[in-house]
Amino acid sequence: MSQTVTNPRIAPLEPPYEPEIDAILKKWMPPGAEAEPLRLFRTLAVHDELASRMRPIGSGILGHGRVEAREREIVIHRTCARAGAEYEWGVHVLAFGKPLGLSDEQIAATVHGAAEDPV
């Protein structure tokens, strides 16, 4: 699934960030997170208006959707795997899949499993 991009079309922002951008990036990360904001977030932050509009959309999808969190994550994992989006797949496995109780076998099935495999 690995695809390395050495020259992205839109490069993510690197620290130090402008104060407004820093505030947006901190809202996207878990409270007290020590890690650098995700590359996806730093790329969205290149366009501050887009960045400010994406948080409510993401929050709505992840926090207020009609699909149960476990099923949502299975769909996201499978979609990321099929699209070769290894980075995003890994983020969702660690941040959501494991905490929601998906087993290693279920997570592996999102990459290597057939459509009819139970997850």
Residue map of PLM features:
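Short, intrinsically disordered, charge-balanced linker/junction segments flanking boundaries
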Residues: 113-119
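Secretory/endomembrane lumenal or extracellular ectodomains immediately following the signal peptide
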Residues: 1-71, 118
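Alpha-helix C-capping/helix-to-loop hinge sites
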Residues: 60-64, 82, 113
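Conserved alpha-helical segments that form or flank metal/cofactor-binding pockets of metalloenzymes
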Residues: 71-108
